[in-house]
C-alpha cells in the first residue's frame, strides 16, 4: 500500500488555527471577538472553529503534510475549512482501517468531500479499498433532518462525476436502509455515519454494524452535538449499550466506536 509517511514535526513550531465558523449563536461578531481575546492570553497552539476553542495543543493535522494537501484540495466551502479537526479524525481512522479487511462506507456523503479527502490522503487513485458512499442527494419535505444547501436534482450525477477517475469509489443514490439491499458490501472496516437524523442513523446501524470487522471503526459525525442533533445521542446510546458498547465522545462533536 502507498500510504502517506509521517511528517517529522519541528519541535519548536506549532500552528494556530482561528477560523470563526460556528453554529447556535445570535451575535456571531461578539463570539468571535471574545474568542480572539482569549487567544491573545493563552499559550499556543490554539484552535478556534466548529464550535470549540482550545489551546496548548499540537494541532497535529497541520503537521501532517499529506493530509493538509488532501484537505485543502477538497475544501469547497467555509464549513469544510472549519471542520478540519473532524476531517483529520476521519483520516486517522481510515489510516487504521485500511490495514484491515473490509470496505469503507459513508452514509450521508452529500458532496463527497469527506470521502475524497480520505481517499486522496491514502493514495488517491491508488486507494487500496472499495469505498461506498450513500445519500438520497435530495430533500423531501417532512424528512426528519434539515435540507442542505445543494440538495436537489442533479447533485447525485455531479458527485458521481467527481469520482469518475476513482474506480474504487461507488456513489449510490437511495434511501437508507432500503438502498443497502441492492448495493452494499458484506465486510466493512470503516463506517462513517453522517445522516443528521436519529431514525436513519439507527437504521444504518441495524443494517451494517454486524458487517463491521473486528477492530473496524465506526464514526458518528453528530453524536456529541446537542442543539438540533441531541436526539441522535439519546437514541444511539441505548442501541450501543444493548450490544455492550459505549460511544467515545470527541470534542469535535463526533462519536467513535471500535468494533470487537
PLM features per residue range, with description:
Residues 1-87, 93, 98-100:
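Rossmann-like AdoMet
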Residues 52, 56, 60-81, 99-260:
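S-adenosylmethionine/decaboxylated-SAM
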